[in-house]
Amino acid sequence: MDVRRRSEKPVYPSKVFGADEKPLKPHNNQQQEDNNTLLIDASDALPLPLYLTNGLFFTMFFSVMYFLLSRWREKIRNSTPLHVVTLSELGAIVSLIASVIYLLGFFGIGFVQTFVSRGNNDSWDENDEEFLLKEDSRCGPATTLGCAIPAPPARQISPMAPPQPAMSMVEKPSPLITPASSEEDEEIINSVVQGKFPSYSLVIQLGDVSAAASLRKEVMQRITGKSLEGLPLEGFTYESILGQCCEMPIGYVQIPVGIAGPLLLNGKEFSVPMATTEGCLVASTNRGCKAIYASGGATCIVLRDGMTRAPCVRFGTAKRAAELKFFVEDPIKFETLANVFNQSSRFGRLQRIQCAIAGKNLYMRFVCSTGDAMGMNMVSKGVQNVLDYLQNEYPDMDVIGISGNFCSDKKPAAVNWIEGRGKSVVCEAIITEEVVKKVLKTEVAALVELNMLKNLTGSAMAGALGGFNAHASNIVSAVFIATGQDPAQNIESSHCITMMEAVNDGKDLHISVTMPSIEVGTVGGGTQLASQSACLNLLGVKGANREAPGSNARLLATVVAGSVLAGELSLMSAISAGQLVNSHMKYNRSTKASS
């Protein structure tokens, strides 16, 4: 092999070139050397000279460390908690962190830059190989040598193929791309897909909630590779949910709304809106409404009205926890606490405080009226005011959480079943023998026996908590979704016991539902949305009642209970008559799935 060392600099012949010939131009690296291009040091990016910057951070590190150590010794002597810091201590901590980061990440920058700026003495470097290959692929003859040499065929140098990435065990979905309406939108979409821009900031960037929802939907399609074509986007006022109902929307879900009724309740007729995807539910409830109407209507009474919130506090001993329990249960002290609580709202009024102790932990269940609002935010604000007041009276009290699950919210709990939460309601009706036979297609005795063995004995065998009914949750959920209530509160709102008894010498049927914790409101949350507001308006309970605050929410609770009464009556009759399977096969079976 002929190995020859290349000269440090290319030597160009001094011979005069032809008219059509150009001398071989020096490589760009050589041009930079000829032009005496200055090399940039890494320390040039610093605002101060390197030695001053290093000295500054050295001084800051040791001075701040000395300050913090002295403050630490003082806190130990004074028994001050270490986590309590002043503004000067906070600034010292930040300065210490900054100096440590600099010393670990940037110290010795002058030493490092010597390697960065050190060049190769040989002007021919590795990058010159590409230059040689390009210049050596000339197609014309080398006439400058004074002889005619046949031109060699030009060599075709194919670029190397980039390395293929290793196969992943999980195949990523191919992005589903829909053309954006403008180049600016396309740029924003790509930024979100690549993780350079957060999706939740689209509203701030665009200034339009609807446009942000449209772009966010397109982003989700590209990231997941799944089509969202069936999820509607147009036809919804997204400004109405901004900051209160839903974050980062990409559309809305359509749920059909049916009407059951008229429901004759306390002498008034109500057309009950029910949002559901379960076939036969509206039809069954409608049949129950018909039976109640034909029998003279139903009567409904609100027994209690009070939303609850139960914070958890802890003391050093159980004795101290008991002292606070006696304090808040004292009628004289309660008046003071009620005044503190009531300052948080025009409608929130503290009714009572129920306490429970677990060791040195105290749970205080605040009960208050909340007007026409469901009231969770209202009662939480009032409880916070009381806790701030008690903190001054009991400085050793440690607030664990404003909610200690003794409330109890969105969970089946015996405290709600026994003490009630929200609106406690009982609804009753007497269904005549004729209606039982002609409308419900069953017998009074059969209904009474079925209710005892199914709703009472059967639920007891199952260990049910508040579930002594046939399907109260079905009706509660449907009315809740239609009227903008919190669907998650269907859990405790569906607590119900259904009672049936033969009256009037066994000819007629007395049926009742007792529901101790219906949590509803006619203002706030989803009640202000257009569709839900229309359903509330249909019932005559839209918004707040200015003349009698809270009456609209209580009326809505009675409508819920009356609808449950109708649903229980119809379903129990269908089971008693053996019609349940046939009716569900007719109304609750998808023809597409069965075909």
Swiss-Prot record:
Catalytic activity annotation: (R)-mevalonate + 2 NADP(+) + CoA = (3S)-3-hydroxy-3-methylglutaryl-CoA + 2 NADPH + 2 H(+)
Membrane topology annotation: Multi-pass membrane protein
NCBIfam families (alphabetical): HMG_CoA_R_NADP (TIGR00533)
Stored PROSITE patterns: HMG_COA_REDUCTASE_1, HMG_COA_REDUCTASE_2, HMG_COA_REDUCTASE_3, HMG_COA_REDUCTASE_4
EC number(s) stated in the UniProt entry for this protein: 1.1.1.34
Tissue specificity field: Expressed in young flowers and in mature sepals and ovaries.
InterPro entries named in the record: HMG_CoA_Rdtase, HMG_CoA_Rdtase_cat_sf, HMG_CoA_Rdtase_CS, HMG_CoA_Rdtase_eu_arc, HMG_CoA_Rdtase_N, HMG_CoA_Rdtase_NAD(P)-bd_sf, HMG_CoA_Rdtase_sub-bd_dom_sf
Keyword Oxidoreductase: yes
Listed pathway(s): Metabolic intermediate biosynthesis; (R)-mevalonate biosynthesis; (R)-mevalonate from acetyl-CoA: step 3/3
Compartments where located: Endoplasmic reticulum membrane
Function statement: Catalyzes the synthesis of mevalonate. The specific precursor of all isoprenoid compounds present in plants.
UniProt keyword Heme, yes or no: no
Organism taxonomic ancestry: Eukaryota, Viridiplantae, Streptophyta, Embryophyta, Tracheophyta
One cellular component term from this protein's GO annotations in UniProt: peroxisomal membrane
Keywords of this entry: Endoplasmic reticulum, Glycoprotein, Isoprene biosynthesis, Membrane, NADP, Oxidoreductase, Transmembrane, Transmembrane helix
Highest taxon in the source lineage: Eukaryota
Segments of this protein annotated with the region Catalytic: 184-595
Encoding gene per record: HMG2
Protein name per UniProt: 3-hydroxy-3-methylglutaryl-coenzyme A reductase 2
Family the entry assigns: Belongs to the HMG-CoA reductase family.
GO biological process: coenzyme A metabolic process; isoprenoid biosynthetic process; sterol biosynthetic process
